[in-house]
Amino acid sequence: MNTIVDRFEKIKSKITSLKPNKTVNIIALSKTFRLSYISPLIEHGHLHFGENKVQEALTKWTDQKKINQNLRLHMIGKLQSNKVKDAVKLFDYIHSLDNQKLADAIAKHQKNLNKNLEHFIQVNIGNELQKSGIPVGELDAFYNYCVNEINLKIIGLMVIPPIEQKPDKYFKSLNELNKSLSLENISMGMSADYIEAIKYGSTFVRVGSSIFGSRS
């Protein structure tokens, strides 16, 4: 058998064998997959799922979250300002917080909707021009603004390393930045490198193709 549940359980076993110091949460990246395809994993009892487009997530998960209030949705893609209200309504975690305008919009809608999401600050640790994320040199000031000025709940940092390079040095750097801010969680590692990410302290890994297969 090679169902999505089988593949998920194999990943869980691999993670357990690493004996991580902290609990590692597997975010099943369900973006682009129909709910009918994902359902066996929900029925298996898995609760953490990731999406990168707000509109797709609304269509897929709004009713499902009413049925199962224990589901936890993670926004892992770039969040546009005009989608923030809907995102705050639906999601439990945002992994792509990286600028003051977005932070202000989230804080405003959280207050209006009486929500308190958990957030990761995305760091552009590879200094890639085309990639989202706050520059390392601006991280401390942005973190302090989010926490002390607008009362966002920042639980950790997030990184997507440059594709063409080995991720280890970026994972190590993010771990050090995370410790410097005394944060408990790290969002890093995907299907190709989640094992390495966990070795460097990741507590949330974002796994898609290793569970669901290739996207058409």
Predicted region positions:
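Conserved alpha/beta-domain cores
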Residues: 1-185, 190-192, 198-200
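Expand to "…catalyze enediolate/carbanion chemistry for C-C bond making/breaking, isomerization
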Residues: 198, 211-216
